[in-house]
């Protein structure tokens, strides 16, 4: 599974920001922004 680049938009499980999950900069928003 490829990880999305730092600060890019994470819009699917295949674009993980941390582990296998997208980490949100703002709670309950989707797509989320990568923080790592």
Swiss-Prot record:
It is found in: Secreted. GO terms for molecular function: calcium channel regulator activity; ion channel inhibitor activity; toxin activity. Neurotoxin. Causes spastic paralysis and death in mice. Moderate inhibitor of L-type calcium channels (Cav1/CACNA1). Pfam families: Toxin_12. It comes from Phoneutria nigriventer (Brazilian armed spider). GO terms for cellular component: extracellular region. InterPro entries: Huwentoxin-1 (IPR011696). Expressed by the venom gland. Belongs to the neurotoxin 10 (Hwtx-1) family. 53 (PNTx27C4) subfamily. It comes from the Eukaryota. This is Neurotoxin PRTx26An0C3. Disulfide bonds join 3-17, 10-22, 16-34.
């Amino acid at each position: 599974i490829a990880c999305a680049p730092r600060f890019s938009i994470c819009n699917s499980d295949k674009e993980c920001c941390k582990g296998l999950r997208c980490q949100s900069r703002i709670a309950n928003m989707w797509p989320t922004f990568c923080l790592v």
